[in-house]
Design a protein with these regions (language model features):
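Glycine-rich phosphate-binding loop plus the immediately following alpha-helix
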Residues: 2-50, 74-84
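Conserved phosphate-binding/catalytic loops in two-lobed NTP-binding clefts
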Residues: 141-165, 180
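Short glycine-rich phosphate-binding loop at a beta-alpha junction
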Residues: 119-130, 152-155
């Protein structure tokens, strides 16, 4: 979760402490034998299910910061699957997918809403592969629409292509002549905070 104060001026508010959202979707899909990548198939199933059918944990919903954790939710879903299989009960895939997806969305939207209120921004942008999730896109638009905050999401055609999203940032730097020196070394594990003006996590008040 990043506060973009200007192009190249980023404040990292918080991030996942374990699994990323897309990774959690992939692992749940794998546990169900639905293949890879898991996001599209889980999303498609969820659209046909009841998000209240199964209660899964909303990890770190009230943690008092902007950190996320998906590992516990993933484990809870896998434990449920294993329990149903041992009992010989058929799993309602749409209901399970919808319940899992809703647990993810509730936390993502709640923390984003608090961040918007704390920073006072008037625009919210959804990025990353998870931006392709229709339910998450709709939840952000509904929540922030009521607050008068403009929501921007990438076209679905590029949401699953990380290279395209990175290229957009590079194009902006190119057009503004924001070139790095030739002494810059490649670092596949570089963090956004290393290139921003402030990498210190921000603790929200009143969460």
């Amino acid at each position: 979760l990043v506060h973009v104060r200007a192009w190249g001026d980023y404040v990292v508010l918080g991030s996942t402490i374990d699994d990323a959202v897309g990774e959690a979707f992939d692992k749940v899909a794998k546990a169900l034998g639905l293949g890879y990548p898991g996001g599209p198939v889980i999303s498609k199933l969820a659209a046909q299910g009841n998000p209240k059918a199964i209660h899964f944990p909303r990890a770190m919903m009230h943690s008092g910061d902007y950190s996320f954790s998906l590992s516990g939710l993933k484990t809870a879903v896998i434990t449920y699957i294993e329990g149903e299989n041992r009992a010989g009960r058929a799993i309602n895939l749409p209901d399970l997918a919808a319940s899992f997806e809703q647990a993810v969305i509730d936390v993502q939207v709640a923390k984003a809403k608090t961040a918007v209120e704390e920073t006072g921004v008037s625009d919210f942008c959804v990025g990353g592969g998870v931006a392709a999730n229709p339910a998450l896109r709709a939840a952000y638009k509904e929540t922030f629409g009521c607050m008068g905050v403009r929501v921007t999401v990438p076209p679905m055609s590029v949401c699953g292509d990380n290279a395209a999203m990175i290229a957009v940032g590079a194009l902006r730097s190119y057009r503004t002549q924001g070139f790095s020196p030739l002494t810059l070394d490649a670092n596949p594990n570089a963090q956004l905070g290393l290139w921003s003006s402030d990498a210190t996590p921000v603790v929200p008040s009143g969460m």
